């Protein structure tokens, strides 16, 4: 606590700051998970509210690792995956997954996936030989603010003399949002498809904007 400069900076977990109850903290979720391993899970609306109100930001892990060596975020993520496997999903996340399956993106599609790179003169890894891929991801492909990050990354790589390319419209979603939402099977399928694409294109090095 000696590192906290004031009360206004004491809260790091969004959900425990909002609900002010230990179950909504990282430690509280670990306790719930440990109890579930011993006695099984009795799903209730409040339990699912606790599970899905975690932003998986990792602040709990940073706080705990200041004083002890333990993994906090992974068990919380695994418990969410178990909820999904048991059919206890969240409607908003169900809609996101449905959109991913339908459009290939975890965020709304606003145009061509590779449009963010227009005018930058970047290589297309499907046509131009290179072993390094700059992977933009869903947000940097379709959201204006994130597109600026991808564009800046491309310019920096160019100035550094890095020989790289992009997948453009052929780029696939990483499935990271599906993983964070607890949909492990969807994530693994996206990973499988990406691995196949990288192998076919001869990619050996990935530079990722997201995730």
Stretches with model-predicted labels:
Residues 1-54:
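Ferredoxin-type iron-sulfur electron-transfer modules and their immediate structural context
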Residues 31-208:
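Iron-sulfur-cluster electron-transfer modules
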């Amino acid at each position: 606590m000696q590192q906290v400069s004031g009360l206004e900076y004491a809260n790091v977990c969004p959900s425990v700051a909002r609900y002010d109850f230990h179950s909504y903290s990282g430690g509280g979720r670990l306790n719930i998970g440990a109890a579930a391993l011993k006695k099984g899970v009795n799903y209730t609306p409040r339990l699912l509210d606790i599970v899905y109100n975690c932003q998986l930001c990792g602040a709990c892990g940073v706080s705990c690792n200041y004083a002890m060596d333990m993994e906090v975020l992974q068990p919380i993520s695994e418990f969410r995956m178990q909820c999904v496997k048991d059919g206890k999903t969240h409607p908003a996340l169900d809609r996101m997954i449905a959109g991913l399956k339908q459009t290939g993106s975890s965020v709304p599609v606003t145009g061509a996936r590779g449009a963010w790179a227009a005018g930058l003169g970047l290589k297309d890894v499907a046509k131009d030989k290179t072993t390094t891929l700059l992977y933009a991801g869903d947000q940097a492909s379709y959201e204006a603010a994130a597109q600026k990050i991808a564009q800046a990354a491309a310019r920096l790589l160019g100035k550094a003399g890095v020989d790289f390319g992009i997948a453009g419209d052929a780029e696939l979603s990483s499935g990271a949002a599906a993983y964070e939402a607890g949909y492990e099977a969807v994530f693994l399928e996206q990973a499988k498809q990406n691995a196949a694409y990288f192998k076919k294109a001869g990619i050996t090095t990935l530079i990722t904007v997201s995730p």
